[in-house]
Amino acid sequence: MNRPAQAAAAAHTFFVANPGHQEMRQNLEYYQAMVGVREDDFTDLEAKPHLSEFRLGVRFYTEEQPAAAILHLEKALEEYFVADAECRALCEGPYDYEGYNYLEYNADLFQAITDHSMQVLSCKQGCVTELASQPGREKALEDFLPSHFNYLQFAYYKNGNYEKAIECAKTYLLFFPHDEVMNQNLAYYTAVLGENLARLIQPREEIQVYRQRSLMEKELLFFSYDIFSIPFVDPDTWTPEEVIPKRLREKQK
């Protein structure tokens, strides 16, 4: 059966993941020229909801449509935490021996528990990279979760909502407390709204919980790296230096 719209979507989905594929590029050009194929038929069938909403939010932000940007960025955050919960749940499984032959793996109970626990925690930390990865892109989006609040604080400001602008600015500063521009923005929003009201506004609770949980996991992973030589690559740039053991910090210099 002739289904050009479905074919266009399938071709677009493949091309998003393989942007260097010339034959598929030609196919897309062919579908674009076909009568009856609309622009919105070229959809990514495998798109992650949180990334799709984020891209829409950023697009409206760039086009100076703050209300639409807020709508999609807030939806992106909702979808992000759904995806994060799913990703972390998948980490809860049996020990993956990776390069080991399980018949040759020899560990006492304490070491086996440690190896498995650290593998699960490392996998959960890896969800940061997994959720920020886009098809066809080699590198994940850096500081993906905090960046939502960078966009949102300014979008809320442009929309005249200083309470939300302050909330989002304070939330962003949980990750980057010394960010000069964000601190200046917060000071301005506070001056406009009034210090008495601004003082009552707190960073988003779910982000405070997320950050605290992440830091606890990082501390355990860095400790096991330092003591048991179980490697850990931190996916975040915002991790405070004091979370990393001194010996590891010195090695990284």
Predicted regions and their residues:
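Short coil turns that delineate tetratricopeptide repeat
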Residues: 18-19, 47, 64, 74, ...
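TPR repeat positional signature
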Residues: 25, 46, 50-53, 149, ...
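Conserved small-residue packing positions in alpha-helical repeats and bundles
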Residues: 1, 12, 29, 57, ...
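Alpha-helical linker/edge segments of TPR/alpha-solenoid repeat scaffolds
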Residues: 2-5, 31-55, 95-134, 189-220, ...
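TPR-repeat structural position
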Residues: 4-5, 66-67, 161-162
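Alpha-helical solenoid repeat scaffolds, predominantly canonical TPR units
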Residues: 9-13, 53, 60, 65, ...
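Boundary/linker segments of alpha-helical solenoid repeat arrays
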Residues: 17-30, 80-89, 174-188, 197-200, ...
